Amino acid sequence: MCIVSHRYIPLTEKDKQEMLQTIGAKSIGELFGDVPSDILLNRDLNIAEGEAETTLLRRLNRIASKNITKETHTSFLGAGVYDHYAPSVVDAMISRSEFYTAYTPYQPEISQGELQAIFEFQTLICELTDMDVANSSMYDGMTSFAEACILAFSQTKKNKIVVSKGLHYQALQVLHTYAKTRKEFEVVEIDLDGTVTDLKKLEAAVDDETAAVAVQYPNFYGSIEDLEKIHSFIEDKKALFIVYANPLALGLLTPPGSFGADIVVGDTQPFGIPAQFGGPHCGYFATTKKLMRKVPGRLVGQTQDDEGNRGFVLTLQAREQHIRRDKATSNICSNQALNALASSIAMSALGKQGIYDIAVQNIEHANYAKQQFIKKGFEVLDGTSFNEFVVKFDKPIQQVNEELVKYNIIGGFDLGVVSDDFKNHMLIAVTELRTKDEIDTFVEKAGELND
């Protein structure tokens, strides 16, 4: 065993020589002799000399201060990642060592606390969506959506899925990526009528070869789809109904399960997960008892031990890749347990009434912003919305956003990135955290820039 002579340096020259001697190599060069010499660097890396910790911290803070964040600027950017209130208890709880490094265990009986936390997450998701079963979490909402489509193909033995272009464009990209690995799968995208799915085109596309119909609720453009009407197109076609739903909106809107949804998926980022670098997030996946044995990911169940005490176990494990890899419903293994815990704590801290109140605030704040834009002379696209809506500008959105930053405002999402049909259109998110003054300032500056 090597003795490390430097407290903070785990690999000294003495250590290197001992290891080389053990494996029978005379030098590092001999060890990597199989690597072609023309691709070797043959010089030391260009790394600066070490600095005192205080000096280094000051320099890194100066670099970090160049970032534009929701702490330094007022954000109206959403499009899948939102600036919501997270109760202080969330960080306090998930930072506990029992949870912070916990991995979903293969021997569940030794991690009852972790399994109970996951069980509570599943229960909360079922309550929000009005579904029977939810899994322990997935990577993000888009992964959950793609897995839902794969389940539909497997369950129905059909090869066509009809999806609304009102779905998040990146969710559609993920689905197309999955579909490329299965050439027989056909993805049919349905155009929009304004900011909602064109129901006539959707109805015409659904036939006996359709495995599933998928929509978002509220959709990517902020509008609320008519789930009851859409479900009526599916009932006699033996296709599954997949709904990608914002869980916060479900605190107020009628849940998809009440409209006959077979699978409800989404992202719990609005509950306790900060907006940072696009992730990490936490996908949820909820379905019916009929489809329970085809659910991807892990399921935690409640049971009793020999003495009658309540306990928790990983259940229906035959679906998983560590049991039968070739027949697994999914190869997702390690999940987002820590983020699922964060969302569970946030939902529990807020309670049903708190979630409802925040959802109402989102609608009220967004509607106020809508009216202010209309008064300012902007064209606001029609559609009943939750906390996002679309505004048309006379100038390129990228240009508008670059100017807004000068006023410490992060503008909305440039929809021209998604479709030429939405060139010069901005998707604006207004959450419960946005104040009247912030909204008024945003509208005022946007109006000045649009003149």
From Swiss-Prot:
Q: Recorded E.C. number(s)?
A: 1.4.4.2
Q: What does it catalyze?
A: N(6)-[(R)-lipoyl]-L-lysyl-[glycine-cleavage complex H protein] + glycine + H(+) = N(6)-[(R)-S(8)-aminomethyldihydrolipoyl]-L-lysyl-[glycine-cleavage complex H protein] + CO2
Cited Gene3D superfamilies: Aspartate Aminotransferase, domain 1, Type I PLP-dependent aspartate aminotransferase-like (Major domain)
Instruction: Please tell me whether the keyword NAD is annotated for this protein.
Output: no
Q: Which cysteines are cross-linked by disulfides?
A: none
Report a single Gene Ontology molecular function: glycine dehydrogenase (decarboxylating) activity
A Gene Ontology BP annotation from the UniProt entry: glycine decarboxylation via glycine cleavage system
Question: Which keywords are on file for this protein?
Answer: Oxidoreductase
What InterPro entries does this protein's entry cite?
A: GcvPA, GDC-P_N, GDC_P, PyrdxlP-dep_Trfase, PyrdxlP-dep_Trfase_major, PyrdxlP-dep_Trfase_small
N-terminal signal peptide: none
Q: What class of enzyme is it?
A: oxidoreductase
Which CDD domains does the protein's record reference?
Answer: GDC-P
Q: Which PANTHER family match?
A: GLYCINE CLEAVAGE SYSTEM P-PROTEIN, GLYCINE DEHYDROGENASE (DECARBOXYLATING)
Q: Which family does it belong to?
A: Belongs to the GcvP family. N-terminal subunit subfamily.
The record's subunit annotation is: The glycine cleavage system is composed of four proteins: P, T, L and H. In this organism, the P 'protein' is a heterodimer of two subunits.
Q: Quote the function comment for this protein.
A: The glycine cleavage system catalyzes the degradation of glycine. The P protein binds the alpha-amino group of glycine through its pyridoxal phosphate cofactor; CO(2) is released and the remaining methylamine moiety is then transferred to the lipoamide cofactor of the H protein.
Q: What is this protein called?
A: Probable glycine dehydrogenase (decarboxylating) subunit 1
Encoding gene per record = gcvPA
